Amino acid sequence: IRVQSYKPSNSAKALAEHLQIPRLSTSSSRFIGRPSDIIVNWGNVNAVHNSHYLNPLQAVKNAANKVTTFKQLQEASIPVPTVHYSKSTLEADKTYFARTNLFGHSGDGIEVGIPTELPEAQLYTEFIKKKHEYRAIVVDDEVVDLKKKLKKRDFEGDRSPYVWNVANGYIFARNDIEFPPTLPQLAIDATKALNLSYGAVDIIQDRNGNLYVLEINTAFGLEGTTTQLVGEAIKKLINKRI
């Protein structure tokens, strides 16, 4: 049993330490995998060894591509923001996110504006004025951690109304928070739709209480309590596959 990430990763390191198993190098390794070996896959899309990968390589590849992600979620009737694959179909008076990098994360490759302000791109999603944003971590069809994005109190920069991330002064919190009752099942259904064994599902809620899935991360951040919760859940998953 090994952990392998798509690039050097503190989260993969933390997971390997919790599981007390070795990590595989992202570039070179003397490890020769066998079909009976299990590799805990942390965002890797390329088969390096002839082994059993958790998560499946193709599922991780699909989750990494924003177009493929939205198409699979739509096919499974998972609620997502209105999606366009051509600039010509956008409505002139609406605000959209243009995804210039289909494999970006943490706001990378996102441009916001009305159609005349946006570049040509392979994917556009309609802006939804969100009231809340959540992250639900799913492992083996169970939600093992729920968090909500909150404004960091001592942040002194300008907050973006569009992208809520650390750079814009937002942090995750889980204590003393009331979560929408349908949130866990939505996260599970979204993970199943992409055939993932585990993932961090980012979900927003609009002012009317509607929930929308934005993406599913397969190499998400791990620290503190999250490492413990995810690590124990993946340990159980490994034991089921041995």
Q: Model-predicted segments: where are they?
A:
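Short helix-loop-beta junction
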Residues: 16-23
